[in-house]
Amino acid sequence: MPIVHVDCWEGIGEEKVKKMIRGITKAIADVGIPAHAVEIVVYEVPKTHWGVGGEPASEKLKDISPPK
């Protein structure tokens, strides 16, 4: 069944990750896939390892932080 991979900046926090997992699972279940068959993998990537427009996000987007 479906495996969903989510890439996000590190630091989003466990509660937000849990909420995201529940929300994604519900969205997939709403189209008829059994919730127990949905797998979700969340990768938290440091902004220093995330490129935007040829620069590390840590430099280009230094004023932006993950939601608290």
Where are these regions (language model features)?
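A domain-level signal for the structural core that forms small-molecule/cofactor-binding pockets
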Residues: 2-68
